[in-house]
C-alpha cells in the first residue's frame, strides 16, 4: 500500500507512444487553415504545434453553441445557435463572458503570474475545439469537455489551451464558456428567473458535442466531462442532474464538487432581493425585478462595487436539481459513470486566501480570527453557535503561536471547502456502484518560487498545468504554460496527461505503462501524485472521521441536551 512506484524516463516515452498509437510525426496533410462542417455552418481554424512532438493540432476557437443571451433572454435558459452563411473564422480567441476583469486578473497566480485577459461580452456562449491534425472526420477519438473554474464569477475557455493534451493524449479537447455571476446564476426561485442558466449553458454545449463532434474526429459515445474548482462543482452537478442524462460517459473533478458549502442554494429569494435593492430595482415583485434587471447594462450588473464579493450559487429549482445534492446522493437517482476525482495537498494555502483578502490576517492568526472567519461556513453546515469553538479547538489543539494557528486555519478551511466534500462525494459514488479513482496531488510546481512563499505546497489549481501539458504548450503567454518546468516536471505532466486521457478512453486510469492506481473501494485506497507516485489509504482518515462521525454525534448530543433542558423548564 505504501510501496513507492517509480516512473523512469523510458517508461514515460513508452506511455506517450502507447497513447498516441502512431508515430510522433504528423501523418496527415499539414493544412494551415483547417475547415470543418458543423450542423450550423462551416468553420475555419488554425494549426498549432506542441513542444516535444511534430504532431500538429487543429484549433477552432469561438464556435457558437447557443444564441447570445441578450435582452429578454438574459436570465433564461440558452437557445440553440442559429446557422450562418459562408465560412466562419474560428482562428482567434473569443471574448470572455461578462465579468469583473480585475477579479479575473488575480487568477494569474495559479501557476506563474501570467494571465491572458481577453475582451468581455454577454455574447459569449462559445466553445473551443482542439483536435490532432491527422485525425480524419468520424475517426472516433475520445472527447474531453473542460469546464473552467473561477468561483462561478470569473474564467474563460481560452485560458485552457487544450493543444498539448490533444496531441499527447490522442483525444479531442473541447473547452466551454458559460454565463457567470449574476448573469449566469441569478434566481428569483420561480418561473421568472429559475436560475442555473450558466449550468444549462454547459448542458447546451454538451448537446452541441453530441451533434457536431464527429466531423472534428471525436466519438460522441465516448465523452468525458472534466473541470476544476467551481468547474468541478458543475461537473459533479451534471452527474446529479436529470437534464444532462446521456450527454457524457465519464467524469473528472479536480478540487471541487457540488456539495462544497455555498455552491448551491435552496432559497435564492433573499439574494435576489439584495441584488435588486442594490441596483435600484423592485424587490417585491419577481416579474418587475427581472424586467428591471434585463434593462440594465451588463457592466452595471457585474461591476457594482456593492456586489463585488457576492457569491452567486446554483439553485435547487425542482427541475435541473429536483432536490438538494445531498438528498440526490442519498437517493441515488444519478448517472452511474466512472469517476476520477481528487484534491491538492495544500488547497487553502495561498491562492484562495489571497483572493479572499486573508493573507495578512493569516500571518497573525488568532483563535478569535479563526472563529469569526469560520462562523458563516459552520452555520451553513448546521453547526450550533455554541459548538463552533469546539470545532476550532479541535484543529488548534494546544498550539499557541501564530504560525501554528495559521497552519491549523489552512487545514480547517481546506477540509471544510474541498477535502471533506470530495471524500464524501466519492463515498456516495462508490456505494452506488460507480467505479471511482481518487487522488491527492502533492507536487509544488517549481514556478511557485517566483510568486509564492516557500511554505506553500500544492496550492489550489496547481495540478492544472500538468493535466493540460503546460511544459509542452507553444504559446508561452498562456495561463498554464510552464516553459521553465524541470525534466522531472515534464515527466510528471506526461504521466498525468496519460492517466487522464486513458481514463477518458477506457474509464480506468491504469495501463501497463502507467503507475498502478488503486480503485477507491471500501478500503479507500487512492493515488498520491508526485514525481514518485505511491498508493495511499484512508485519505486524512482522522479528520474525515471527525466530520462524518464525531462531530455529527456531538451535535446530536447537544441537541438532545437542549431538548431535555427545555422539557425540564416546561415542567
UniProtKB/Swiss-Prot annotation:
The active site is at 229 (acyl-ester intermediate), 347 (charge relay system), 460 (charge relay system). It comes from the Eukaryota. It catalyses: a carboxylic ester + H2O = an alcohol + a carboxylate + H(+). CDD domains: Esterase_lipase (cd00312). Disulfide bonds join 97-124, 281-292. GO terms for cellular component: cytosol; endoplasmic reticulum lumen; extracellular exosome. Its EC number is 3.1.1.1. One of its GO terms (biological process) is xenobiotic metabolic process. N-glycosylated. Expressed in liver, colon and small intestine. Gene3D superfamilies: alpha/beta hydrolase. One of its GO terms (molecular function) is carboxylic ester hydrolase activity. Keywords: Disulfide bond, Endoplasmic reticulum, Glycoprotein, Hydrolase, Serine esterase, Signal. It is found in: Endoplasmic reticulum lumen. A motif (Prevents secretion from ER) lies at residues 568-571. Glycans are attached at residue 105. Residues 1-26 form the signal peptide. Involved in the detoxification of xenobiotics and in the activation of ester and amide prodrugs. Shows low catalytic efficiency for hydrolysis of CPT-11 (7-ethyl-10-[4-(1-piperidino)-1-piperidino]-carbonyloxycamptothecin), a prodrug for camptothecin used in cancer therapeutics. Belongs to the type-B carboxylesterase/lipase family. This is Carboxylesterase 3. The lineage of its organism: Eukaryota, Metazoa, Chordata, Craniata, Vertebrata. The gene is CES3.
